[in-house]
């Protein structure tokens, strides 16, 4: 299967999963994603109480932002973020490794809240900015 075919299959499954379930836990743990987790990116789901918020917010957690070489030039991560943005899904990125990712997500309309644990690891939750 060619890279473009794999990417197209991934997004078709992603859209179907989100449209049919609207449940990030079920989506992130869908066994059909096992192949793509190895090829593209590792993800999970989490609900987070944001300080001052009245409700829980749901985030898709992206654990590994390093893609295999054959997929880097195909724009997989950019396409995934665009897709999640269109679906209104918040993102939690574990282990931030470069500022370009911050800038990219900020430009897409996400507001960052940075967290550092006791070991010094940085993770960042990106909540979609409220539309006026």
Residue ranges and their predicted role:
Residues 1-28:
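Short amphipathic alpha-helix that is part of the acyltransferase structural core
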Residues 30, 79-83, 102-104:
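Hydrophobic, well-ordered beta-alpha structural blocks that scaffold small-molecule cofactor pockets
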Residues 72-86:
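Conserved acetyl-CoA-binding loop-helix of GNAT-fold acetyltransferases
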């Amino acid at each position: 299967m060619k890279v473009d075919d794999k990417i197209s299959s991934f997004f078709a499954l992603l859209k179907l999963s989100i449209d049919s379930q609207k449940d990030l836990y079920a989506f992130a743990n869908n066994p059909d994603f096992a192949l793509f987790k190895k090829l593209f990116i590792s993800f999970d789901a989490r609900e987070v109480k944001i300080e001052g918020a009245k409700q829980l917010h749901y985030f898709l957690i992206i654990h590994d932002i390093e893609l295999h070489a054959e997929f880097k030039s195909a724009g997989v991560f950019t396409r995934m973020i665009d897709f999640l943005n269109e679906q209104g899904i918040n993102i939690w990125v574990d282990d931030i490794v470069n500022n370009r990712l911050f800038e990219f997500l900020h430009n897409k309309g996400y507001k960052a809240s940075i967290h550092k644990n006791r070991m010094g690891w940085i993770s960042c939750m990106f909540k979609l900015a409220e539309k006026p």
